[in-house]
Amino acid sequence: MCIRDRCTVTILSMIGLFNIAGTLTSGYLAQKLSKKLILSTIYLARGLVIAIFIFLPPSPIIAVGFGIAFGFLWLSTVPPTMGLVGFIFGTKYIGLLYGIVFLSHQVGSFLGAYLGGVFHDLYGSYDYAWYISIALSIFAGLIHLPIIEKQVPRIQTT
């Protein structure tokens, strides 16, 4: 596809650079708009970006474009997720609650990497891992829509 080392470094650099921009942008938007809609949009956009990437013919420009787009979307879920969890459940146990969110994220990361390798070993391609990523992105985008952005009642202690 391209000179591997140079192209890989460029893609990783774009992911890192645009990750900053995406996180700052989503944090700003989370102060102004519905957090569940921001999250839904981000997850659906991830699925779209992955679909575009795997269905276009491979080239260095496509790979760098994917790095830019996916970098922008990569950790942009963190600010609205933190804001939503903090708003709904309050901040008293925010560390524990976000720890649970982050743990589930890490389990998903492990499964994505591991199953990608399993699919490659079984089928000689990562295609099925990409297809599942698209489906899970769509699922994540849709599952956020019914979230009710309302604080849960607090138990008063004396």
In which residue ranges do the predicted regions lie?
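Short, small-residue-biased leader/transition segments that mark boundaries at the very start
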Residues: 1-3
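Loop-to-transmembrane helix entry/capping segments in MFS-fold secondary transporters
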Residues: 5-6, 91-101
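C-terminal transmembrane helical hairpin of 12-TM major facilitator-type secondary transporters
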Residues: 7, 13-19, 25, 32-84
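Small/hydrophobic positions within alpha-helical transmembrane segments
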Residues: 14, 18, 45, 69, ...
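Conserved kink/hinge residues within transmembrane alpha-helices of Major Facilitator Superfamily
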Residues: 23-27, 113, 144
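Interfacial helix-cap and linker-helix signal at transmembrane-aqueous boundaries
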Residues: 29-30, 115-124
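Paired intracellular helix-loop junctions of major facilitator superfamily
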Residues: 85-94, 124
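Multi-pass alpha-helical transporter architecture, strongest
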Residues: 134-158
